[in-house]
Amino acid sequence: MLTWLNRNSLDFPPLEKALREPNGLLAAGGDLSADRLISAYRHGCFPWFQDGQPILWWSPDPRTVLFPEELHISRSLAKVLRQSRYRVTFDQDFASVIKACAAPRSYANETWITGSMQAAYVELHRRGHAHSVEVWDQDELVGGLYGLAMGQLFFGESMFSRADNASKVGFATLVEHLTAWGFVLIDCQMPTQHLHSFGARSIPRQTFADYLSRHLDQPTDADWSARRV
């Protein structure tokens, strides 16, 4: 039975209560306050819903993750990186990145990054939890991604690309820095061919939960100050 959240409590049900079909649906309701979102990620779930639906919270089993040391760079992407065609920055234009991620894709008319979701993550960015990667072609924003950093874990949310390989360059650059900063895992949530091409793989939900308990409160050398990287 699906759990409906109490607006007066930030608690989530145990992950093992998530439905098998649809895979990982854990709870519904609540709100998108910054405190609830932080509680959700620390618990191992994330919001994902369409306009007109209640807020839905998910914790799929298995969980798709990327271990930074397992990053795979294809020969074609390595060539693009060597060419330094694009300029990559962190936290210089979070609002534009999430707005671009929210734009409907060619294969879908709707977006799950609703206006309320955008506002919620902009607030998380203001609080220092959510971060953006911007990819520039001269002064034009042509790609990027955003997510949350908590302890030694990075929770990827969405990416976009308006030029060849732009989002790939941003993601590869991010992983390079996360590795140097001491991050141990990148949460990719759900499997995609794009993520698997980078070396992402699926692990049991309980294994993911174990990583949360061990690494959420561990320090890193992260420096997200808005700058070119």
Curated annotation (Swiss-Prot):
Localisation: Cytoplasm
Catalytic activity as recorded in UniProt: N-terminal L-lysyl-[protein] + L-leucyl-tRNA(Leu) = N-terminal L-leucyl-L-lysyl-[protein] + tRNA(Leu) + H(+); N-terminal L-arginyl-[protein] + L-leucyl-tRNA(Leu) = N-terminal L-leucyl-L-arginyl-[protein] + tRNA(Leu) + H(+); L-phenylalanyl-tRNA(Phe) + an N-terminal L-alpha-aminoacyl-[protein] = an N-terminal L-phenylalanyl-L-alpha-aminoacyl-[protein] + tRNA(Phe)
GO molecular function, one term: leucyl-tRNA--protein transferase activity
Entry's Gene Ontology BP terms: protein catabolic process
EC numbers for this chain: 2.3.2.6
InterPro entries listed in its UniProt record: Acyl_CoA_acyltransferase, Leu/Phe-tRNA_Trfase, Leu/Phe-tRNA_Trfase_C, Leu/Phe-tRNA_Trfase_N
Keyword Transferase in record: yes
One cellular component (GO) term of this entry: cytoplasm
Claim: Acyltransferase is one of the keywords in the record: yes
Top-rank taxon, per record: Bacteria
Keyword line: Acyltransferase, Cytoplasm, Transferase
Gene3D superfamilies documented for this protein: Leucyl/phenylalanyl-tRNA-protein transferase, C-terminal domain (3.40.630.70), Leucyl/phenylalanyl-tRNA-protein transferase, N-terminal domain (3.30.70.3550)
Known role: Functions in the N-end rule pathway of protein degradation where it conjugates Leu, Phe and, less efficiently, Met from aminoacyl-tRNAs to the N-termini of proteins containing an N-terminal arginine or lysine.
Similarity section: Belongs to the L/F-transferase family.
Protein name per Swiss-Prot or TrEMBL: Leucyl/phenylalanyl-tRNA--protein transferase
Species per Swiss-Prot/TrEMBL record: Pseudomonas syringae pv. syringae (strain B728a)
Gene name tied to this protein: aat
